Regions:
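N-proximal low-complexity "stem/linker" segments adjacent to membrane-targeting elements
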Residues: 1-28
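Cell-envelope/extracellular polymer assembly enzymes that use nucleotide-activated donors
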Residues: 4-7, 35, 174
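A conserved acidic beta->alpha catalytic loop
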Residues: 32, 40-49, 91
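Short beta-strand/loop segment that forms part of the nucleotide-sugar
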Residues: 34-42, 64-67
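Short aromatic/hydrophobic "clamp" motif used to bind/position activated sugar donors
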Residues: 87
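Conserved donor NDP-sugar-binding/catalytic core segment of glycosyltransferases
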Residues: 95, 99-129
């Protein structure tokens, strides 16, 4: 294992429209002790050509391209290849802020399991909204930070055998919850770590996908009354999706 501090993992599949912006945000980081691994799922567009452009500019970029079982399978491949002490998962249509990784490392301690911060939500009309991460204690029933707004110790991801592929949309929540329940030590910084485009799979309302929250709470025994907590969270999600989001789009 090398002494690289942060391994940035980006899963791609036909991501050419947005990938260049994501990779540029990595290059523009004030924090420079990183590697960036692109895990591609046999893209049919020019995703790999873009990746190779960045590899030619900077040896810290590298990639693999092979069939996978979805984004969390790609994420698992990524951490297994990673050489860094910390793992950061960046969406292929998202950006890490210029000082994002520096801000996280500024609050790092030897005992920390996860370092996390806030985010900017970027909407399809180009507008953005600052979104504060939830307190870590809420990890028992919801994903307190977005996975793009946090870094996790690689040793803990390995200890938990990575992402559970039974979860198509909430595997990041499942893994992060397991780490929280077993190891604790989530450290927060009130800084924006990422800019996230609000068009991803986890941002689309699909009740079957939301049921994964109930399944993982039961699996991890994270709350005393999982069904009650599930409906409490889902009510808030419904209000946000059907009332608050349309109001934002009308502004």
């Amino acid at each position: 294992m090398s002494n690289i501090k942060i391994s940035i993992i980006i899963a791609t599949f036909n991501s050419a429209k947005t990938l260049r912006v994501a990779l540029n945000s990595v290059m523009l980081q004030t924090f420079q002790d990183w590697e960036c691994i692109v895990v591609d799922g046999l893209s049919k567009d020019n995703t790999l050509e873009i990746v190779k452009e960045f590899e030619a500019k900077d040896v810290r970029f590298h990639h693999i391209s092979e069939a996978d079982k979805g984004i969390y399978d790609a994420f698992n491949k990524g951490w297994k290849l990673a050489k860094g002490e910390w793992i950061y998962y960046l969406g292929s249509d998202d950006q890490v802020t210029k000082n994002g990784l520096t801000d996280l490392m500024d609050v790092s301690t030897s005992e920390a399991s996860v370092l996390y911060g806030d985010m900017y939500a970027i909407f399809e009309d180009g507008s953005e909204r600052y979104v504060k991460a939830h307190p870590a204690k809420q990890m028992t029933y919801l994903m307190a930070p977005s996975h793009q707004g946090m870094i996790t110790r690689r040793t803990l991801i390995e200890a938990e055998n990575g992402f559970d592929l039974q979860f198509r949309v909430r595997a990041d929540f499942d893994l992060t919850q397991r780490i929280y329940l077993k190891y604790g030590n989530f450290i927060y910084t009130p800084k924006a770590i990422t800019k996230c485009l609000q068009t991803g799979l986890s941002n689309q309302f699909n009740f079957k996908h939301h049921l994964e929250r109930l399944t993982l709470m039961r699996k991890n025994n994270s709350v005393r009354f999982p069904l009650l907590m599930f409906w409490y969270v889902e009510w808030k999600v419904l209000v946000r999706h059907w009332i608050l989001k349309p109001l934002h789009l009308r502004k």
